[in-house]
């Protein structure tokens, strides 16, 4: 089992190689990447688009592997155990990991195509969008669509966000949360067309099903992704929404695994970075001889949009459950809203809008499956004495940075070693360099203010 070939060079593949080496794998690892860039954190593309970060800061650390860029794997010969590429090369493997990711699902709109229609998936996409001038329409009001609209607004564009559902981020937010998000975006300057679909594109204008016309020299599609399964299909591996894997992240061929956006586990192909990283961690441990199992990922989503503090935990369905205790705090005058769904004193779902102090506490309680404090209001308001999930009150093994699996103990050790600011802690531990959602938590832990621009530019390099 010395030769491992990884098809794909995104965050999941990079994390896998890092963890394999950390577990002591000394064999040959070959990585085949389609893009021209070395591995980078695509989760933060929105921050590049709004100029908070530069493209260089998204680069992930160099790994100990033979990395091939600008190559596409075209065929798996399972009998000979080799992967063929479009360059004509063959790469033999003892174990093969498919981390092929996903591709944007572009809408078919009469009159729209070519340079007028753009996805936001790669650094190259980011550069093309960044070079555009004039009004922009964003299709899709999910997480990526909201982040893209906010980023484009920050660049000075006139932005219209078109979403077919009545409220934004409908997979993560309830009606109230979606309405508050729409109000906040509207106040910032984003034009919203909710409950509408684009039906045509004519002379620089997007025509909606309401007959409204939206000016758009460029249309950015944030309308979902499709798992890249073609290689697996050609190899005869079972594929549904993604490449089907078991709890050991194996396909029907015991020598072939799949992780990340391309994988379907237990009927789910989440497309979330947290799932990709947890799968990479689990697979690395398994390939190193461990006996772990991947059982799914607890979903915590934090919007990365300048000036908006919003997090969603679990499924929106949990918030509407009739057999759960639901705690709601609404403060419309200050643009704040919180909703918790509890079952047996544990958090099963949450929406937190405008409560940055509570996000860390609620996330930790959810992650660790801990009972919530009796004083629910104190939890939401972030009252330190009543919040066992606050960073300073957490046990040493609590994970502060989910993206890079950085514990409070590791951060404390780095702080004692001289890393006294958020950027210094980022360099020492890589905390905050994933999705950026733990910046405030790390800042509170070290008693330093969190400057998001400074921490990410220095920490993610």
Regions found by a protein language model. Name each.
Residues 1-67, 151-172:
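Beta1-alpha1 glycine-rich phosphate/pyrophosphate-binding loop at the start
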Residues 8-11, 34, 121, 139-144:
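Glycine-rich Rossmann-fold phosphate-binding loop(s) that bind the pyrophosphate
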Residues 135, 145-199, 276, 294-305, ...:
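Rossmann-like dinucleotide-binding cores of NAD(P)H-dependent redox enzymes
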Residues 356-374:
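A short, polar/charged loop-to-alpha-helix boundary motif
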Residues 397-411, 427-447:
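Local cysteine-cluster metal-coordination motifs and their immediate loop/turn environment
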Residues 1, 60-137, 207-209, 220-223, ...:
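FAD-binding core/adjacent interface of flavoenzyme oxidoreductases
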Residues 113-134, 202-207, 211-278, 371, ...:
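FAD-site-proximal beta/loop scaffold in flavoenzymes
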Residues 2-3, 262-360, 386-400, 405, ...:
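Mid-to-C-terminal Rossmann-like scaffold of FAD/NAD(P)H-dependent oxidoreductases
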């Amino acid at each position: 089992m010395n030769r491992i070939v990884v098809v794909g060079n995104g965050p999941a593949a990079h994390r896998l190689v890092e963890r394999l080496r950390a577990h002591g794998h000394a064999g040959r690892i070959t990585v085949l990447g389609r893009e021209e860039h070395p591995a980078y954190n695509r989760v933060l593309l929105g921050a590049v688009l709004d100029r908070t970060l530069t493209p260089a800061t998204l680069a992930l650390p160099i790994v100990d592997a033979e990395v091939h860029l600008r190559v596409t794997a075209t065929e798996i010969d399972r009998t000979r155990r080799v992967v063929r590429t479009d360059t004509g090369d063959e790469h033999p493997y003892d174990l093969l990991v498919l981390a092929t990711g996903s591709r944007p699902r572009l809408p078919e709109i009469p009159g729209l195509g070519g340079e007028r229609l753009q996805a936001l998936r790669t650094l190259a996409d980011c550069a093309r969008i960044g070079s555009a001038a004039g009004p922009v329409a964003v299709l899709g009001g999910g997480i990526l669509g909201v982040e893209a609209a906010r980023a484009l607004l920050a660049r000075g564009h006139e932005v219209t966000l078109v979403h077919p559902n009545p409220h934004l981020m409908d997979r993560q937010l309830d009606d109230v949360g979606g309405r508050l998000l729409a109000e906040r975006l509207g106040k910032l300057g984003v034009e919203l067309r909710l409950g509408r679909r684009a039906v045509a594109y004519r002379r620089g204008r997007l025509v909606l099903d309401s007959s409204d016309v939206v000016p758009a020299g460029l249309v950015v599609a944030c309308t979902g992704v499709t798992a890249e399964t073609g290689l697996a299909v050609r190899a005869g591996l079972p594929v549904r929404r993604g490449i089907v894997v078991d709890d050991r992240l194996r396909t029907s061929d015991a020598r072939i695994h799949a992780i990340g956006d391309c994988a379907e586990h237990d009927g789910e192909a989440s497309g979330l970075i947290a799932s990709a990283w947890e799968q990479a961690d689990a697979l690395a441990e398994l390939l190193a001889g461990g006996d772990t199992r991947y059982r799914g990922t607890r979903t915590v989503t934090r919007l990365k949009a300048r000036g908006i503090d919003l997090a969603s935990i679990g499924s929106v369905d949990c918030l509407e459950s009739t057999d759960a205790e639901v705690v709601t705090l609404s403060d419309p005058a200050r643009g704040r809203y919180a909703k918790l769904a509890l079952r047996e004193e544990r958090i099963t779902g949450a929406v937190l809008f405008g409560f940055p102090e509570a996000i860390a506490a609620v996330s930790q309680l959810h992650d660790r499956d801990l009972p919530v404090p009796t004083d629910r209001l104190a939890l939401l308001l972030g009252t330190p004495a009543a919040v066992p999930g606050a960073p300073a009150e957490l046990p040493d093994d609590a994970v502060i940075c989910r993206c890079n699996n950085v514990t409070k103990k590791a951060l404390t050790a780095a702080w004692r070693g001289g890393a006294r600011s958020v950027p210094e802690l980022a360099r020492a531990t890589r905390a905050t360099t994933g999705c950026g959602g733990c910046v405030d938590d790390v800042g509170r832990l070290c008693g330093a203010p969190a400057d998001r621009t400074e921490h990410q530019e220095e920490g993610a390099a």
